[in-house]
Amino acid sequence: MHEVDVAVVGAGPAGLFAAYYAGFRGLSVAVVDALPEPGGQITAMYPEKLIHDVAGFPAVKGRDLVANLVAQAAPFDPRYLLGTRAEKLSYADDRPVLGLAGGEQLRCGAVVITGGLGSFTPRPLPVAERFVGTGIVYFVPQPAELTGQDVLIVGGGDSAFDWAVTLQPLARSVTLVHRREKFRAHAATVARVRALPVRVVVNAEVTRLHGGGAVTGAEITVRGGAAESLPVNTVVAALGFTADLGPLAEWGLRLDRRHLVVDSTMATNLPRVFAAGDITEYPGKVRLIATGFGEAATAVNNAAVALDPAAHLFPGHSSDGT
């Protein structure tokens, strides 16, 4: 059985910062994640994409942000249990015990859940399923691999427009197709794409893909119009994801749809179990990486008091000793 002061469930940005902050407070910490590498969705889905809304960074690549967070926590030697799912939650002597996949247990003084959206599955593009792996992708871990290609992006959300911005300087052509006239993407990103040599087609759907082993072309049909053929080497299907909390849904946590309800201390309804990041829900919640960092610090500070009621909630600033 492993034993630590704080167990962080989820190794995305909020979880990695929680690991740093627990170490800063002198607490031992373990980080558990079902994915094989730290970084959560950033590492799995968009490591090369530029992120523009993290304080102090005009723009930072996803993989660089993750690397910096891991380096920030490294002096405190957090234990990473990656490729390992936290499946059960129980209590022994009023302390949480996590049951891990494979039968191991992790006993801790407090749990901080930073599971993001939970496990996520891309929504499929029906006409393209036979080309998965040979022309259709749901994320682009290495954008440079699409250099000189004709790229078709399907979707109207932030991911679709972010990929258009990222791929336009590399690809021979970029076409973005959305089935509606209005977009869910941030207005500033839409305006940026409109200013680039990216073709945007609205009220349209991809009705057919051409190719033998690999994609060579696509047909798009505008509502009420005829099909149009265009050359395509890669289709980026940015249609969103279906999320699943997995075993967390069976732990007895109070849920609001797929999110964990927390109070102002980031405490859940279960003793010594806190949460931070996109997985949380409270009045006025805004799901940003930046807000997740603050929530992680709040959760860890309150977890520290749960471990030792005599401890100060605010430990001082990290710069106080310099």
Task: Describe each model-derived feature in a short phrase.
Residues 124, 129-147, 234-290, 294, ...:
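FAD-site-proximal beta/loop scaffold in flavoenzymes
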Residues 12-14, 37, 119, 158-159, ...:
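Residue-level detector of alpha-helix initiation sites
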Residues 36-60, 186-190, 194:
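Conserved N-terminal glycine-rich FAD pyrophosphate-binding loop of Rossmann-like flavoproteins
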Residues 4-30, 163-165:
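N-terminal Rossmann-like FAD-binding beta1-loop-alpha1 element of flavoenzymes
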Residues 67-100, 105-108, 168-264, 307, ...:
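A Rossmann-like FAD-binding core segment of flavoenzymes
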Residues 149-170:
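Rossmann-like NAD(P)H-binding beta-loop-alpha module
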Residues 23-44, 174-184:
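Glycine-rich FAD pyrophosphate-binding loop
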